Structure formats: structure tokens, C-alpha cells
């Protein structure tokens, strides 16, 4: 039996159509055997767990909590300890991929916590993380893996935008340049996946600049705490901030920042004095 809750009820329609039961509040899930959570921030997760109608607002707690959000290691450690104090098991298991990856069966996950807990829920995780789930050890180690993953995401998209605009400034069409990159040893699944957006300026949201900024900040915070120098990440964070400045010039700044993070290329182009237009190319 699968029970679900979503802050935006309409987003649960597909699962309800597949047979899941939609509950009215997180507190209605307090008695389940295994609870999976995925929200945007640690603040959101705290509300889901401990708010007035939170999962742990009453006396009951799910037997196993599998937490899949991108949050900091200290926040995760706090939630883990609370779960343990209430007699529950807690597995940190963030994922890599967006909605399109899920539909294509290409989502992956990374897990940390008690190995027996992981073994108990692994087959359930693999139902959605079809590319596999990597167990990396105890505690919050998976949080550091996900933070590092999203730091790479930010550095990659920023540099991809920069070199694409560099090529365009020299006279190379974006679609031609990205075709070359994708066919080269430097191409990747990600560059191929983002090519249609960068060529045709399609900012259908998969991941937003505010969420990327949050994750870069988490990465830099972890770097300070662990004594690791990350100058490229710091520069990427500053470059990203300029996109927020560009957004303030838009008619709908909030709406613009809710668009996909690949729109960063518009800020790079603006700084180069280039006005982007869609190339209207059927690129894969």
C-alpha cells in the first residue's frame, strides 16, 4: 500500500491514478513502514517533519525514514538523531536527475547510513533509481556526494554557457558548436541534454538558479569546514549571482528566476554585448 502527500496536490495526480492514496497532511504518514521525503530545502524538510501537522508532530514515527532531498550534512545529522531518538531508522539517499531522467529510467541515487537499513530498502529505491544506488558508508557521507555533484553541475553549466557564447561571438552558430562538443571527448550526457535549451532558448524548468545557488553555498560551506580550497566553485558562485542581478531588470524577476538554470547563458551573453535569439533547430 502506497500513501503520498504533496504540497501541490495536482503534482500527485499521476500517482493517485496509478493507485496510490493521497493523504491530507504529513502527519497522516506517521504510521507507515517506510517514508520517502524529497523537498527543496532543509527548512522545507523541517516543516514536513516537525510542523504543526508534520510527520513527527505526534507520538508516532515511521519505522524507516529515507530522506532524498539536497540538504546540508549538519541538517541531515540533526534529523537522523531525532529519528533515532524516536526509535526509527534513517537513511540519507539524495538522487541525481530530474523529471525527464525519471521518465527515461535514468535516475540514480547515493545512500549513507546503517548498512542493514540500506539493504532493507534497496529494492524499493531501485524502483525509481533505475540506473542504480551507490552505498557510500555511514552517517551523512551521501550528503557530501550530492553536494559535490551539484557543485559540478553549477561549474559545468556556467562554463558551457561561457564557451558557447565565446564561439558565438566569433561567428559560430550555437547549434554547430554544441554539436562539435557533444561529438568530442569533452561531450557528456549533460551537454547533450542541455543542447536544445541552449540552442533554442527553451527555459522549461528542470532546476532553478535559486536551488543551484543554495547548493553552491552548501558546497562552499562544507569546503570551509573541511579545509578544502575551491576557487573555481567560488568564482562560479559569483558568476551565478550576476544572473540574479540580470533578473532584477526583467518585468517578472521571480518568474525569470523560476525558469531553468540554463538561462544563465543569457547573462553571459548580456555581459558580452550579445542579444540571444532562438536558432529554431531540431537538435537532439
State each model region's role.
Residues 2, 22, 89-91, 174, ...:
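Hydrophobic beta-strand scaffold residues
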Residues 278-284:
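Eukaryotic N-terminal low-complexity, Ser/Thr- and Lys/Arg-rich leader segments
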Residues 140-267:
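Helical "substrate-binding/catalytic lid" subdomain
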Residues 1-38, 63-64, 78, 99-102, ...:
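NAD(P)+-binding Rossmann beta1-loop-alpha1 motif at the extreme N-terminus of oxidoreductases
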Residues 22, 26-91:
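Rossmann-fold NAD(P) dinucleotide-binding segment
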Residues 48, 69-151:
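Rossmann-fold dinucleotide-binding core
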Amino acid at each position: 500500500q502506497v500513501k503520498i502527500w504533496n504540497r501541490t496536490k495536482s503534482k500527485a495526480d499521476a500517482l493517485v491514478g496509478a493507485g496510490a492514496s493521497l493523504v491530507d497532511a504529513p502527519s497522516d504518514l506517521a504510521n507507515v513502514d517506510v517514508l520517502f521525503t524529497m523537498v527543496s530545502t532543509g527548512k522545507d524538510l523541517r516543516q514536513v517533519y516537525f510542523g504543526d501537522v508534520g510527520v513527527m508532530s505526534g507520538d508516532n514515527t515511521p519505522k524507516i525514514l529515507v530522506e532524498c532531498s539536497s540538504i546540508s550534512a549538519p541538517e541531515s545529522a540533526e534529523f537522523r538523531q531525532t529519528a533515532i531518538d524516536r526509535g526509527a531508522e534513517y537513511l540519507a539517499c539524495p538522487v541525481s536527475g530530474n523529471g525527464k531522467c525519471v521518465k527515461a529510467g535514468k535516475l540514480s541515487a547515493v545512500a549513507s547510513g546503517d548498512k542493514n537499513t540500506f539493504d532493507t530498502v534497496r529494492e524499493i529505491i531501485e524502483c525509481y533509481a533505475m540506473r542504480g544506488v551507490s552505498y557510500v558508508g555511514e552517517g551523512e557521507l551521501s550528503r557530501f556526494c550530492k553536494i559535490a555533484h551539484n557543485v559540478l553541475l553549477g561549474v559545468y553549466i556556467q562554463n558551457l554557457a561561457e564557451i558557447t557564447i565565446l564561439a558565438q561571438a566569433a561567428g559560430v552558430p550555437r547549434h554547430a558548436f554544441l554539436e562539435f562538443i557533444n561529438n568530442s571527448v569533452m561531450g557528456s550526457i549533460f551537454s547533450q541534454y542541455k543542447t536544445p535549451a541552449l540552442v533554442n532558448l527553451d527555459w522549461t524548468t528542470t532546476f532553478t538558479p535559486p536551488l543551484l545557488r543554495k547548493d553552491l553555498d552548501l558546497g562552499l560551506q562544507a569546503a570551509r569546514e573541511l579545509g578544502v580550497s575551491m576557487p573555481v566553485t567560488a568564482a562560479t558562485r559569483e558568476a551565478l549571482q550576476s544572473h540574479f542581478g540580470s533578473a532584477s531588470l526583467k518585468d517578472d524577476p521571480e518568474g525569470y528566476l523560476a525558469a531553468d538554470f540554463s538561462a544563465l547563458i543569457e547573462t553571459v551573453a548580456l555581459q558580452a554585448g550579445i542579444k540571444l535569439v532562438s536558432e529554431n533547430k531540431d537538435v537532439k
